[in-house]
Amino acid sequence: MATQLEQLKKEFLEYIEIEKGRALKTVENYDRYISRYFEFSKVKNPSDITAESVRTFRLWLNRQSLGNNKATGKTMSRKTQNYYMIALRVFLKYLTRRKVTSMAADEIDLAKVPERHLDLISPSDLARLLKASPGDDIKSLRDRAILELLFSTGLRVSELCSLTKDVDFTSGEFSIRGKGGKIRVVFISEEARDTLKKYLKLRKDMSEALFVQIGSQKKNDMDMKPLTRRSVERIVKQCAIKAGISKKVTPHVIRHCFATDLLSNGADIRSVQMMLGHANIATTQIYTHVTDAHLREVHKKFHRKKE
């Protein structure tokens, strides 16, 4: 029989999925984070959640070794530890909303994390990457369309995988449902639009997904499977290797390139925030460190050169 706390957790997860419109992946993560705290602290009732039990749990998380080789000494990052605390805070806020007596959410502080480091590739590497799948067969066109679409829209890989064939690309813009169910408009380049048109012209299957698995499919298979996040990540990685790029390249690296390209060329940060789908402008401001460095170089090169 489920404890009172387990029942409240179940209702909380249903609440954030239905009322708050959180993605299923987010709901699953919250379930895992909160359950891990319950198991470690052996709490049964809301009143059992205390500052001391949370502190002990945080200490335990901080000492957890990662991977199979504990000898490496690599432990859980503060950022990952914060995910557990954020989930617990949101759950406690829900309990307060339900007038259930428990620990106050604001008693949980988040750990300070090191300043985020952006993984970027140079403009010349990016140009080679976009040309890494030059053929006119369906697989080459699909891979090229993925690269062009990622760079011209700044889509997250999960957003890219959710696209269907009925998206109207002819206008050069379309709406996408992003994190938290929020809808935003993204814009596509002529290169992306042209490549997508050629790719879709060769599609003979009945799948609704925009991007599908091709290599392992039979020629007469009319129901091709949609690409997964892992599949897209693998395609981007393979194209980067073909382009001779030594750095690790992921769909998110291309998203970073999209943002820095806009800011470096004069776009205002609010517009970039909207195009990326960031809820908080502070998330977008990490890109200004890169563009500030670019502007410093411009200033150094051109300022007061007549003297």
Would you name each region that the model predicts?
Residues 1-307:
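Conserved catalytic core of the tyrosine transesterase superfamily
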